[in-house]
Amino acid sequence: GPRAAGAAVRAFLRRRAGVRPERGQQTAAAVVDWFPYATTGGVPNAYLHAGHLFVAGTPCRVSTILGSCVSVALFDPVAQVGGLNHFLLPQGPENTAPSARFGTIAVPWLIDALVAAGAQRRALQAKVFGGACVLRAFRTTAGNLGTKNVQVAKAILQAEGIPIVAEDVDGERGRKLIFQTHDGAAWVRSL
């Protein structure tokens, strides 16, 4: 089930990293979490918090709330493995411990976690969500935080050769996202 898949992903990422995190330091293994809260039609639901990622090799619906943050949803339609991240900033300051709060870390960690859970890298498809400019004061500013988050996500996916098959980005309103890990279906509602 999802908990076993999560444990396998965490073990793989610990081995791949080859280092033990210091106290308070985040690793990909530490942010692949399972937050079950109900089932709908026999499919478990999970809520994804900002700065985390979620991967499942069994059917699951993952929801999150986005403003200027971005979520990249990845899925392998053949292996029926999918996952979602939720990052807040395009990148962290220099000399900052790696964290899924940053797009430059969260997107590669999500790719690695999906491959560890059984997805084939060449079969991965992406959907990108979020990146709104929700603060009125910044709406006239070119290159607002939401736009930068979207740009980072798209650049990494392009560099990794992962096609973006759908997106709902930018704008002035937040979004509620629900993503199904097993088939890549996604629903977005403006807030």
Predicted regions located by residue number:
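Extreme N-terminal basic, low-complexity initiation segments
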Residues: 2-8
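Phosphate-centric recognition/catalysis
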Residues: 27-40, 44-64
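Short glycine-rich phosphate-binding loop at a beta-alpha junction
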Residues: 123-130
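Divalent-metal-activated hydrolytic enzyme cores
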Residues: 146-191
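Conserved active-site and cofactor/substrate-binding residues in soluble primary-metabolism enzymes
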Residues: 48, 79, 101-105, 109, ...
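Phosphate/ribose-phosphate-bearing ligand recognition and processing surfaces
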Residues: 135-147
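Conserved mixed alpha/beta catalytic, RNA-binding, or beta-rich assembly cores of soluble enzyme
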Residues: 62-117
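Short acidic-glycine loop/turn motifs at beta-strand connectors
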Residues: 57, 76-80, 180-183
